[in-house]
């Protein structure tokens, strides 16, 4: 059991290490602010199964996203992380708007196993649950479209550690 657990943890870390690479390849749909898109991609897991939850994201992007991590917490809790001290963003060393969660949260990582370019509803994902820390990038809210109760909002899931 120990070798299997160790191997699966290593595999998860390797998959999550690619998160920053995959995240840089997409563009926010125009109907969303960056905070709304963050919430859609990383908080609002519409189903307990990756195959179904990823359909929401894939429909907006019109492609099978290679991987995605859903934090099993609330948007308000992630907003609170934005109040933690600023750190350099691991995925972009020129940015200093990242914040470490300070506590581990349950999460579900979805990794594309079966792409389906012709029919994105047929994309299939492996699902890996874990409890991990996260690093999130935060920016000032969009004053026209984000709710005023959060002046600073999460805009990018930078790293899972």
UniProtKB/Swiss-Prot annotation:
Keyword terms, alphabetized: Disulfide bond, Endonuclease, Glycoprotein, Hydrolase, Lyase, Lysosome, Nuclease, Signal
UniProt-annotated catalytic positions: 42 (proton acceptor), 156 (proton donor)
Catalytic activity: an [RNA] containing cytidine + H2O = an [RNA]-3'-cytidine-3'-phosphate + a 5'-hydroxy-ribonucleotide-3'-[RNA]; an [RNA] containing uridine + H2O = an [RNA]-3'-uridine-3'-phosphate + a 5'-hydroxy-ribonucleotide-3'-[RNA]
Binding site for substrate: 65-69
The EC number(s) this enzyme carries: 4.6.1.18
Highest taxon above the source species: Eukaryota
UniProt GO molecular function: lyase activity; nucleic acid binding; ribonuclease A activity; RNA nuclease activity
The keyword Flavoprotein is assigned to this record: no
SUPFAM superfamilies found in the cross-reference section: RNase A-like (SSF54076)
Listed transmembrane segments: none
One of the protein's GO biological processes: chemotaxis
Residues of this chain annotated as glycosylated in UniProt: 34, 44, 86, 92, 111, 119
Function (record text): This is a non-secretory ribonuclease. It is a pyrimidine specific nuclease with a slight preference for U. Cytotoxin and helminthotoxin. Possesses a wide variety of biological activities.
Subunit structure, interactors included: Interacts with and forms a tight 1:1 complex with RNH1. Dimerization of two such complexes may occur.
Family: Belongs to the pancreatic ribonuclease family.
Designated name of the protein: Non-secretory ribonuclease
Organism: Pongo pygmaeus (Bornean orangutan)
Gene symbol of the encoding locus: RNASE2
């Amino acid at each position: 059991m120990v070798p299997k657990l160790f191997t699966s943890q290593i595999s998860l870390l390797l998959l999550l290490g690619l998160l920053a690479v995959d995240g840089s390849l997409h563009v926010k749909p125009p109907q969303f602010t960056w905070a709304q898109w963050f919430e859609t991609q990383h908080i609002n897991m519409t189903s307990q199964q990756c195959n179904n939850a990823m359909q929401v994201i894939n429909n907006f992007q019109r492609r099978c996203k290679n991987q995605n991590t859903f934090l099993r917490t609330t948007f308000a809790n992630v907003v609170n992380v934005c109040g933690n001290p600023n750190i350099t963003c691991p995925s972009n060393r020129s940015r200093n708007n990242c914040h470490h969660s300070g506590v581990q949260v349950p999460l579900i990582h979805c990794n594309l196993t079966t792409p389906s370019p012709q029919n994105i509803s047929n994309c299939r994902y492996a699902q890996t649950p874990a409890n991990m820390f996260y690093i999130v990038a935060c920016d000032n809210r969009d004053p026209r479209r984000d709710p005023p109760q959060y002046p600073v909002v999460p805009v990018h899931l930078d790293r899972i550690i």
